[in-house]
Amino acid sequence: MSDVYVLGVDMIKFGRFPDRTVPNIGAEAALMALDDAGLTIKDMQSMYCGNLGQANAMVGQRILQEIGQTGIPVVNCANACATGATAFREAWMSIKAGIYDVVLAVGVEQMGKGLLGGAGGGDGIPKEGLLGSGTMPCVFAEAGMEHSKDHGTTFE
């Protein structure tokens, strides 16, 4: 098994960018991380892209269209609030397993207005109708309460 090192990281400033596409935002972040590592997309053997809001839109491949298509495999990940972390984990595991030596992991999202944005039916649903539902804050809150009940975990 191989040691795994993070060679470069970066991120764009948080904000709303209605005039930009998700791949354009992701491409900027990817290029900044590659620059931080002193590498280019041509050095990469694979790419792992985390995006939930447009998970069916091949965001990773569209990022490569902007920064340079090299023929490398692209894995698109969607895993709710852990999407970016999942892309990083998959990239890390591919190196640890000895499949690749150098890969790129990128996470990108463009949030809509409100809790559910435009993807999940958000507008017009009162807060009271969302509580106790499958929204991710509720899921995590319920998991925390269950852990507290089973193991005596406290807020401290």
Predicted features by range, described:
Residues 77-80:
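Blade-loop segments of beta-propeller domains
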Residues 66, 90-99:
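Alpha-helix C-terminal capping segments
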Residues 1-74, 108-156:
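Conserved "HGTGT" condensation-loop signature of ketosynthase/thiolase-family condensing enzymes
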Residues 87-92, 143-144:
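Short alpha-helical segments and helix-capping/turn motifs at coil-helix boundaries
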Residues 44, 99-103:
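Short, high-confidence coil segments that cap the C-terminus of an alpha-helix
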Residues 84:
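Short conserved active-site loop signatures built around small residues
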